[in-house]
């Protein structure tokens, strides 16, 4: 007897994924609740003394939000979810749920190559898992409609995912070599959309 591969609709996994991301993005900001007012009682001093913490938490919050947008873009074009895609999504959610750990490490310690490398490397892992999900969805029969895969928007999404992962990997290498200010190179992500659009038109 041939057993058909297990496949499910995407609604439940989308709802579950949204819940995990919402919890992770909330936990990320909890360290701010432990901040104490400085001796001079000024809010401006509170912000200046904790500028690195605010900056790191804000950056991580924005990046998780962008990953969530990418996740929604992917699953909006998916008809069904098979077991490999489900496990890839669970791995992605595990990495998202642990994002507060590298964020806390980078905001509480000096910017050494190990500290910044771990932080950027963790984001590269999340992006790579997203790219693997998209790669599997594009090639596995029935998960995405062929016309969606072959459309300009579909090709643009594929190139965007590859480029985003590539930028994270490049910044990861930079972080290992020159950790001070390495995260500024994440602004290279601003060039991803126009490049992906141009590649998709070829």
What are these regions (language model features)?
Residues 1-202:
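Multi-pass alpha-helical transmembrane bundle typical of ion/small-solute transporters
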